[in-house]
């Protein structure tokens, strides 16, 4: 489909605005995936706070120029689906990783987080980041365990002191 200059500028402006507020980005190749499966992926992405769009590679290069996602430029080859995580850095990576397990033709190319290129083989680094709620839960359980351990040690010391007396 041929795009005129105004359409291209509108696409670059829209995706650039999203990229400015994004925490991470993941690039994938969706050749061979059925429309129904892609619709499911897009729906899951909206629910997870992930912005997804298929954009021409030349336009994507303009979008990422001067941003933390510039390291992805070399991955813009062939049909490119880009996903930006808006709420949690690992959301898009987790979504694409799970989708790739169920769809063999879906290929994750790379990801970017804080200006660092993460190859597809290491996408788990980003996908396994805990969500904010999970991190809080882990912190609270650690704090709770530490307090309980301290209480047990204090009671044991009091018991030992009474036995010695």
Curated annotation (Swiss-Prot):
Keywords: Ribonucleoprotein, Ribosomal protein, RNA-binding, rRNA-binding. GO terms for molecular function: large ribosomal subunit rRNA binding; structural constituent of ribosome. One of its GO terms (biological process) is translation. InterPro entries: Ribosomal_uL10 (IPR001790), Ribosomal_uL10-like_sf (IPR043141), Ribosomal_uL10_bac (IPR022973), Ribosomal_uL10_bac_type (IPR047865), Ribosomal_uL10_CS_bac (IPR002363). GO terms for cellular component: large ribosomal subunit. Transmembrane segments: none annotated. Forms part of the ribosomal stalk, playing a central role in the interaction of the ribosome with GTP-bound translation factors. HAMAP family: Ribosomal_uL10. Belongs to the universal ribosomal protein uL10 family. Part of the ribosomal stalk of the 50S ribosomal subunit. The N-terminus interacts with L11 and the large rRNA to form the base of the stalk. The C-terminus forms an elongated spine to which L12 dimers bind in a sequential fashion forming a multimeric L10(L12)X complex. This is Large ribosomal subunit protein uL10. It comes from Pectobacterium atrosepticum (strain SCRI 1043 / ATCC BAA-672).
């Amino acid at each position: 489909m041929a795009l005129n200059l105004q359409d291209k500028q509108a696409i670059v402006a829209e995706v650039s605005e999203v990229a400015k507020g994004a925490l991470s980005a993941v690039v994938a190749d969706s050749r061979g995936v059925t429309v129904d499966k892609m619709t499911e992926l897009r729906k899951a992405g909206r629910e997870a706070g992930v912005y997804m769009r298929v954009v021409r590679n030349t336009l994507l290069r303009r979008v990422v120029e001067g941003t933390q996602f510039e390291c992805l430029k070399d991955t813009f080859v062939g049909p490119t689906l880009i996903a930006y995580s808006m709420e949690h850095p690992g959301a898009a990576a987790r979504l694409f990783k799970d989708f790739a397990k169920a769809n063999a033709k879906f290929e994750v190319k790379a990801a970017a987080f804080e200006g660092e290129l993460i190859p597809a083989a290491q996408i788990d680094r980003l996908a396994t980041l805990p969500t904010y709620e999970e991190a809080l839960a882990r912190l609270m359980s650690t704090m709770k365990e530490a307090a309980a351990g301290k209480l047990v040690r204090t009671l044991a010391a009091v018991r030992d002191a009474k036995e010695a007396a």
